[in-house]
Amino acid sequence: MGAEPAEKAPVGASPTGASHTSGSAGSSGGSSSGASSSTPSTSAPTTPSATVPSHVPVLPGSSVTGPATKLPGYTDSAPAGEPLAWHAGSPRVEVSGGVDAFAARFDPGAVRFELHAGSQVPGGSGWPGGNAASTSGLLAGWNGGFLMANNASWGGFYLGGHTAFGPLRTGTASEVFYKDGSMDVLAWPGGLPSTDVVGVRQNLALMIDDGKLAADLNDGTAADERTWGFTNNSADVHGNRSGIGVTVDGKVVYAAVHNASPLQLAQYLQRAGAVRAMQLDINFTRPIFGTYADGRWTEPAPWLGPAGRFTSGNERDFVTVYTR
């Protein structure tokens, strides 16, 4: 596939939102720095709280109308503006939507999440896990956010005691990964990661916090690009977008929308139940998501990038989901 134009960062100051108190992510110690180890000790996160069942063939709360093993082909039966209708997809994955907008929901009691460093972003050596994920127990995966070079993402990357692209930025929206395999989405509270945090991927500001949409989500105006990133067409802020969030009961929700504004992505995440959420990637086939079963990847929409990169070796950071 041909080379894609480089991403352009939003303009303006980095976010400075207050920390969220849902879980213990950072400590009050000083800023983390490149290739440094974290030492502060704090309590384990309270959200999400993972209780690992011995066997979970279908997630709690699924509205299963028949056998379903593949992600594509579902129709969102909920009227516009109402909560999404969920279905059982691949084992331990709930899904909703179709080819223009879809969401996947994961219960941290049934699955675990892993952050991976890419061979080029963040690059370098010594990162745990490698840039090609194991297929043992693999369920799904998605790619990270904006390029972290030149402050495009308003933040940094932390994994296995080391950071890249400067210290983690206070207030920046962050995927936070814990030792127990759970994850959270929150505004980084500042300081070094606590000892129960194994990974952090930062990107822009929260789109949703405390169940409320961010005040600077403008429906298709130029202000959107200054905050949420420039699209392929400078005259139109609509593009392919992905995001990640958490529900009030700790489930993790991934969503992707086709040719949509930042507000439309945030509204879709909100309909999926997210009370905190952040944008991940935008434009072209940069948003990547797939489910893994029977030795192969399945992408739910043709405008997504190939998820096979996650097991063959990916140049940029990504997240994988495994069965517990």
How should each PLM-predicted stretch be described?
Residues V93-G98, K179, V248, G313:
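Short, ordered beta-strand-loop transition motifs
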Residues D107, H116-R271, V275:
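Aspartyl protease catalytic domain
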Residues F284-R324:
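C-terminal regions of proteins
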